[in-house]
Amino acid sequence: MQVFQVEGVHLRADTALEGATQHSVYHPDSLHQPQPDWLAEEVPVALVYNGISHVVMMASPKELELFALGFSLSEGIIQSPADIYGIDVLPACNGIEVQIELSSRRFAGLKERRRAMDGRTGCGVCGVEQLAEIGKPVSPLPFTQTFSLSKLENALVRLRDVQKIGQVTGCTHAASWVAPDGTLCGGSEDVGRHVALDKLLGARAKQEWQQGAALVSSRASYEMVQKSAMCGVEILFAVSAATSLAVEVAQRCNLTLVGFCRPGHATIYTHPQRLSE
Protein backbone atom coordinates (compact mmCIF):
# COMPACT_ATOMS: atom_id res chain seq x y z
CA MET A 1 0.00 0.00 0.00
CA GLN A 2 1.46 3.36 -1.04
CA VAL A 3 1.63 5.98 1.70
CA PHE A 4 1.61 9.78 1.35
CA GLN A 5 2.37 12.37 3.98
CA VAL A 6 0.20 15.39 4.73
CA GLU A 7 1.10 17.72 7.62
CA GLY A 8 3.32 15.03 9.08
CA VAL A 9 0.54 12.43 9.06
CA HIS A 10 0.85 9.34 6.89
CA LEU A 11 -2.04 9.07 4.44
CA ARG A 12 -2.84 5.68 2.98
CA ALA A 13 -3.65 5.52 -0.71
CA ASP A 14 -7.16 4.29 0.12
CA THR A 15 -7.93 7.27 2.37
CA ALA A 16 -10.57 9.77 1.23
CA LEU A 17 -9.30 13.30 0.63
CA GLU A 18 -11.79 16.01 -0.29
CA GLY A 19 -10.88 17.57 -3.62
CA ALA A 20 -8.65 14.69 -4.73
CA THR A 21 -9.22 11.37 -6.40
CA GLN A 22 -7.13 8.28 -7.07
CA HIS A 23 -5.87 7.09 -10.43
CA SER A 24 -3.53 4.35 -11.57
CA VAL A 25 -0.22 5.63 -12.93
CA TYR A 26 2.94 4.12 -14.38
CA HIS A 27 6.59 4.96 -13.87
CA PRO A 28 9.55 4.38 -16.22
CA ASP A 29 10.97 1.60 -14.06
CA SER A 30 7.61 -0.22 -13.82
CA LEU A 31 5.76 0.34 -17.09
CA HIS A 32 3.71 -2.82 -16.68
CA GLN A 33 2.84 -2.35 -13.02
CA PRO A 34 0.25 0.31 -12.21
CA GLN A 35 0.50 2.15 -8.91
CA PRO A 36 -2.12 4.31 -7.15
CA ASP A 37 -1.61 8.05 -7.18
CA TRP A 38 -3.61 11.15 -6.26
CA LEU A 39 -5.03 13.65 -8.74
CA ALA A 40 -6.56 17.02 -7.87
CA GLU A 41 -10.21 17.18 -8.90
CA GLU A 42 -11.22 19.90 -11.35
CA VAL A 43 -14.91 20.45 -12.08
CA PRO A 44 -17.02 23.12 -13.78
CA VAL A 45 -18.72 25.31 -11.17
CA ALA A 46 -21.62 27.52 -12.26
CA LEU A 47 -22.41 30.59 -10.17
CA VAL A 48 -26.15 31.25 -10.46
CA TYR A 49 -27.58 34.50 -9.08
CA ASN A 50 -31.31 34.51 -8.36
CA GLY A 51 -31.84 31.77 -10.93
CA ILE A 52 -29.69 33.33 -13.67
CA SER A 53 -26.37 31.69 -14.56
CA HIS A 54 -23.60 34.29 -14.46
CA VAL A 55 -20.32 32.46 -14.99
CA VAL A 56 -18.83 28.97 -15.11
CA MET A 57 -15.38 28.49 -13.60
CA MET A 58 -13.15 25.44 -13.34
CA ALA A 59 -12.42 24.83 -9.67
CA SER A 60 -11.68 22.34 -6.92
CA PRO A 61 -15.00 21.05 -5.50
CA LYS A 62 -14.50 22.32 -1.94
CA GLU A 63 -15.18 25.56 -0.02
CA LEU A 64 -17.54 26.66 -2.77
CA GLU A 65 -19.63 28.81 -0.44
CA LEU A 66 -16.50 30.84 0.31
CA PHE A 67 -15.75 30.99 -3.41
CA ALA A 68 -19.22 32.34 -4.16
CA LEU A 69 -18.90 34.99 -1.44
CA GLY A 70 -15.38 36.02 -2.43
CA PHE A 71 -16.15 36.14 -6.15
CA SER A 72 -19.24 38.23 -5.52
CA LEU A 73 -17.18 40.72 -3.50
CA SER A 74 -14.12 40.82 -5.75
CA GLU A 75 -16.22 41.32 -8.88
CA GLY A 76 -18.24 44.13 -7.31
CA ILE A 77 -21.52 42.21 -7.48
CA ILE A 78 -22.08 42.83 -3.77
CA GLN A 79 -20.69 45.34 -1.29
CA SER A 80 -20.89 43.19 1.84
CA PRO A 81 -21.80 39.62 2.86
CA ALA A 82 -25.19 40.96 4.01
CA ASP A 83 -26.13 41.42 0.33
CA ILE A 84 -26.33 37.62 0.02
CA TYR A 85 -29.36 36.00 1.64
CA GLY A 86 -28.36 32.39 1.01
CA ILE A 87 -25.97 30.05 -0.84
CA ASP A 88 -26.79 26.48 -1.89
CA VAL A 89 -24.27 24.10 -3.47
CA LEU A 90 -25.96 21.48 -5.65
CA PRO A 91 -24.75 18.77 -8.02
CA ALA A 92 -25.45 19.55 -11.66
CA CYS A 93 -24.86 17.91 -15.02
CA ASN A 94 -21.13 17.13 -15.14
CA GLY A 95 -20.40 19.70 -12.47
CA ILE A 96 -21.66 21.79 -9.57
CA GLU A 97 -24.16 24.63 -9.40
CA VAL A 98 -23.83 27.26 -6.69
CA GLN A 99 -27.15 29.04 -6.26
CA ILE A 100 -26.78 32.50 -4.72
CA GLU A 101 -29.73 34.54 -3.49
CA LEU A 102 -28.95 38.24 -3.86
CA SER A 103 -30.76 41.20 -2.38
CA SER A 104 -33.11 42.79 -4.89
CA ARG A 105 -30.93 45.91 -5.09
CA ARG A 106 -27.74 44.02 -5.91
CA PHE A 107 -29.52 41.73 -8.35
CA ALA A 108 -30.91 44.77 -10.18
CA GLY A 109 -27.37 46.12 -10.45
CA LEU A 110 -26.10 42.81 -11.79
CA LYS A 111 -28.84 42.66 -14.42
CA GLU A 112 -28.07 46.22 -15.50
CA ARG A 113 -24.40 45.35 -15.88
CA ARG A 114 -25.27 42.31 -17.97
CA ARG A 115 -27.62 44.35 -20.16
CA ALA A 116 -24.85 46.87 -20.77
CA MET A 117 -22.73 44.04 -22.15
CA ASP A 118 -25.38 42.73 -24.54
CA GLY A 119 -24.44 43.12 -28.18
CA ARG A 120 -20.77 43.79 -27.51
CA THR A 121 -18.17 41.59 -29.11
CA GLY A 122 -16.21 39.52 -26.63
CA CYS A 123 -12.46 40.06 -26.66
CA GLY A 124 -11.67 36.60 -25.34
CA VAL A 125 -9.61 37.83 -22.39
CA CYS A 126 -10.61 35.68 -19.43
CA GLY A 127 -14.30 35.91 -20.32
CA VAL A 128 -14.37 39.71 -20.11
CA GLU A 129 -16.84 41.18 -22.58
CA GLN A 130 -14.86 44.22 -23.65
CA LEU A 131 -11.35 45.57 -23.33
CA ALA A 132 -12.55 48.45 -21.17
CA GLU A 133 -13.29 45.91 -18.44
CA ILE A 134 -9.56 45.13 -18.20
CA GLY A 135 -8.19 47.16 -15.32
CA LYS A 136 -11.57 48.68 -14.52
CA PRO A 137 -11.47 51.61 -12.09
CA VAL A 138 -10.98 50.68 -8.44
CA SER A 139 -11.22 53.24 -5.66
CA PRO A 140 -7.71 54.08 -4.39
CA LEU A 141 -6.90 52.18 -1.23
CA PRO A 142 -6.11 54.03 2.02
CA PHE A 143 -2.74 53.66 3.72
CA THR A 144 -3.82 52.08 7.00
CA GLN A 145 -1.77 48.86 6.98
CA THR A 146 1.91 48.25 7.73
CA PHE A 147 3.85 44.99 7.60
CA SER A 148 7.33 43.88 8.65
CA LEU A 149 8.96 41.71 6.00
CA SER A 150 10.78 39.77 8.72
CA LYS A 151 7.38 38.46 9.88
CA LEU A 152 6.63 37.10 6.41
CA GLU A 153 9.18 34.30 6.67
CA ASN A 154 7.08 32.22 9.07
CA ALA A 155 4.08 32.54 6.76
CA LEU A 156 6.13 31.42 3.76
CA VAL A 157 7.27 28.33 5.64
CA ARG A 158 3.71 27.52 6.75
CA LEU A 159 2.03 28.26 3.41
CA ARG A 160 2.39 24.66 2.30
CA ASP A 161 0.26 23.57 5.27
CA VAL A 162 -2.72 25.14 3.51
CA GLN A 163 -2.22 22.84 0.52
CA LYS A 164 -3.46 19.51 1.80
CA ILE A 165 -4.44 18.50 -1.73
CA GLY A 166 -1.32 20.04 -3.18
CA GLN A 167 0.96 18.05 -0.90
CA VAL A 168 -0.18 14.78 -2.46
CA THR A 169 -0.93 15.97 -6.00
CA GLY A 170 1.46 18.86 -6.64
CA CYS A 171 -1.44 20.52 -8.43
CA THR A 172 -2.99 23.35 -6.39
CA HIS A 173 -2.45 27.02 -5.63
CA ALA A 174 -2.76 28.46 -2.14
CA ALA A 175 -3.95 31.81 -0.84
CA SER A 176 -3.61 32.74 2.84
CA TRP A 177 -4.27 35.67 5.13
CA VAL A 178 -1.21 36.67 7.14
CA ALA A 179 -1.58 38.55 10.40
CA PRO A 180 0.95 41.32 11.18
CA ASP A 181 2.86 38.94 13.47
CA GLY A 182 3.31 36.44 10.61
CA THR A 183 0.63 34.01 11.76
CA LEU A 184 -1.50 32.40 9.07
CA CYS A 185 -5.08 33.20 10.07
CA GLY A 186 -6.46 30.85 7.43
CA GLY A 187 -6.18 29.93 3.80
CA SER A 188 -7.63 28.15 0.81
CA GLU A 189 -6.36 26.06 -2.06
CA ASP A 190 -7.66 25.38 -5.54
CA VAL A 191 -6.51 24.19 -8.93
CA GLY A 192 -7.09 27.77 -10.10
CA ARG A 193 -5.08 30.59 -8.56
CA HIS A 194 -7.89 33.12 -9.01
CA VAL A 195 -10.38 30.76 -7.40
CA ALA A 196 -8.03 30.14 -4.46
CA LEU A 197 -7.83 33.91 -3.95
CA ASP A 198 -11.61 34.32 -4.18
CA LYS A 199 -12.04 31.61 -1.54
CA LEU A 200 -9.62 33.46 0.72
CA LEU A 201 -11.41 36.76 0.15
CA GLY A 202 -14.67 35.04 1.07
CA ALA A 203 -13.13 33.64 4.26
CA ARG A 204 -11.66 37.05 5.10
CA ALA A 205 -15.06 38.71 4.78
CA LYS A 206 -16.72 36.00 6.84
CA GLN A 207 -14.09 36.05 9.59
CA GLU A 208 -13.69 39.85 9.42
CA TRP A 209 -9.90 39.74 9.18
CA GLN A 210 -8.76 43.35 8.79
CA GLN A 211 -5.13 43.67 9.83
CA GLY A 212 -2.56 41.89 7.69
CA ALA A 213 -1.90 40.92 4.09
CA ALA A 214 -2.77 38.34 1.45
CA LEU A 215 -0.16 35.77 0.40
CA VAL A 216 -0.51 33.66 -2.76
CA SER A 217 1.64 30.76 -3.92
CA SER A 218 1.41 31.80 -7.57
CA ARG A 219 2.36 34.72 -9.76
CA ALA A 220 0.43 37.96 -9.38
CA SER A 221 -1.74 38.77 -12.39
CA TYR A 222 -3.70 41.99 -12.91
CA GLU A 223 -6.89 40.10 -11.98
CA MET A 224 -5.48 39.08 -8.61
CA VAL A 225 -4.42 42.65 -7.88
CA GLN A 226 -7.81 43.96 -8.95
CA LYS A 227 -9.72 41.38 -6.90
CA SER A 228 -7.63 42.17 -3.83
CA ALA A 229 -8.12 45.91 -4.21
CA MET A 230 -11.87 45.50 -4.71
CA CYS A 231 -11.99 43.80 -1.30
CA GLY A 232 -9.88 46.42 0.45
CA VAL A 233 -6.69 44.36 0.68
CA GLU A 234 -3.79 46.82 0.86
CA ILE A 235 -0.85 44.39 0.65
CA LEU A 236 -0.46 41.39 -1.68
CA PHE A 237 2.52 39.04 -1.42
CA ALA A 238 3.18 36.56 -4.24
CA VAL A 239 5.68 33.71 -4.27
CA SER A 240 6.30 34.23 -7.99
CA ALA A 241 6.55 37.28 -10.23
CA ALA A 242 4.05 40.00 -11.06
CA THR A 243 3.00 40.92 -14.57
CA SER A 244 3.42 44.41 -16.01
CA LEU A 245 -0.34 45.02 -15.99
CA ALA A 246 -0.56 43.83 -12.38
CA VAL A 247 2.07 46.40 -11.40
CA GLU A 248 0.26 49.12 -13.34
CA VAL A 249 -3.06 48.36 -11.65
CA ALA A 250 -1.42 48.09 -8.20
CA GLN A 251 0.29 51.45 -8.65
CA ARG A 252 -2.96 53.10 -9.71
CA CYS A 253 -5.07 51.74 -6.83
CA ASN A 254 -2.43 52.22 -4.08
CA LEU A 255 -1.90 48.49 -3.45
CA THR A 256 1.49 47.34 -2.17
CA LEU A 257 2.53 44.50 -4.49
CA VAL A 258 5.45 42.24 -3.63
CA GLY A 259 6.72 39.30 -5.70
CA PHE A 260 9.41 36.62 -5.54
CA CYS A 261 8.73 36.24 -1.83
CA ARG A 262 11.23 33.86 -0.26
CA PRO A 263 12.79 33.71 3.19
CA GLY A 264 15.17 36.65 3.18
CA HIS A 265 14.16 37.94 -0.25
CA ALA A 266 11.36 39.92 -1.87
CA THR A 267 10.86 42.22 -4.85
CA ILE A 268 8.69 45.23 -4.02
CA TYR A 269 6.94 46.60 -7.10
CA THR A 270 4.69 49.33 -5.70
CA HIS A 271 4.05 51.47 -2.62
CA PRO A 272 6.88 50.27 -0.33
CA GLN A 273 5.90 52.78 2.37
CA ARG A 274 3.65 50.18 4.01
CA LEU A 275 6.62 47.85 4.57
CA SER A 276 9.51 47.71 7.00
CA GLU A 277 12.43 45.34 7.45
Swiss-Prot record:
It comes from the Bacteria. One of its GO terms (cellular component) is cytoplasm. InterPro entries: Cytidine_deaminase-like, FdhD. Its main location: cytoplasm. It is found in: Cytoplasm. Coiled coil: none annotated. One of its GO terms (biological process) is Mo-molybdopterin cofactor biosynthetic process. Belongs to the FdhD family. Required for formate dehydrogenase (FDH) activity. Acts as a sulfur carrier protein that transfers sulfur from IscS to the molybdenum cofactor prior to its insertion into FDH. This is Sulfur carrier protein FdhD. The gene is fdhD.
